[in-house]
Regions:
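Conserved RNA-binding domains used in RNP assembly and mRNA/RNA metabolism
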Residues: 1-76
Length: 76
């Protein structure tokens, strides 16, 4: 849950049962893993479908991907 707390206000990707992937800004969550996303969009291959503000029921969540931060390697 700490990772979710650190991701509040940031973009995440949520994979749901049935293979659906949704990307959006994490606005909130609860202990049951119910998730509130703003600016959400469903990812369908190279296409996206705008969903806006949504609530995802926790028992449908398979995976939550935190924001990926690129850190270049230092050359020594």
């Amino acid at each position: 849950m700490e990772l979710l707390q650190e991701s509040l206000g940031k973009s995440i990707i949520v994979k749901l049962k049935g293979g659906v992937k949704i990307r959006g800004i994490l606005d909130g969550y609860d202990p049951h893993l119910n998730i509130v996303l703003s600016d959400a969009e469903e990812l369908k291959g190279s296409e996206t479908a705008k969903l806006g503000l949504i609530v995802i029921r926790g028992d449908n969540v398979i995976l939550i991907s935190p924001p990926i931060e690129y850190k270049p390697e230092e050359k020594g």
